[in-house]
Structures are given as structure tokens and as C-alpha cells.
Amino acid sequence: MSLIEFLFGRKQKTATVARDRLQIIIAQERAQEGQTPDYLPTLRKELMEVLSKYVNVSLDNIRISQEKQDGMDVLELNITLPEQKKV
């Protein structure tokens, strides 16, 4: 690296700096284990609204959990549907 490149070298673009900072923030948030995401109650309510259009299911029959497995976030959704009556 010459003195001229050092003094007048290219500066990083603000978009690149912003992207790098955002990636750091996201990595820090993902590293915080044991915290329940804020969106789960809303997700549960919205799922209930959609499911109620098609089947009669109560909120107690919907279980949503989030955990880490092999370094990946896993969102698990369990819905217990009512038994269908045989005709």
C-alpha cells in the first residue's frame, strides 16, 4: 500500500457500512437464547383466525414453540384438530 493510497484511498460506501452493522445486530439478537420472540402471541392469534374459517378449533389446541437445533432457529407449530364425525 503506497502513501497515496493510504491518504486518498477509497472509503466504504454508507450502504456497505449499514449492511455490516445490521448483520452484527441480527447476529447478536440471534445469539440471545432462551428469549421468546415478540411475534409469537400475534402469530398464534392470526393462525386462530385463519383456522376458524375452516375448522372449529380452540386456542388451547394450538401450540407454538421456538428453539435452536444444530445452530438453526426452528419454529414448531402443533395444532390438534377435532375428530371428524363419521356419517
Curated annotation (Swiss-Prot):
Ranges in a coiled coil: none
GO biological process, one term: cell division
Keyword vocabulary terms for this entry: Cell cycle, Cell division
UniProt superkingdom: Bacteria
This protein's name: Cell division topological specificity factor
Family: Belongs to the MinE family.
Keyword DNA repair: no
Transmembrane regions: none
Annotated organism of origin: Neisseria meningitidis serogroup A / serotype 4A (strain DSM 15465 / Z2491)
Record-linked Gene3D superfamilies: Cell division topological specificity factor MinE (3.30.1070.10)
Biological role: Prevents the cell division inhibition by proteins MinC and MinD at internal division sites while permitting inhibition at polar sites. This ensures cell division at the proper site by restricting the formation of a division septum at the midpoint of the long axis of the cell.
InterPro entries (alphabetical): MinE, MinE_sf
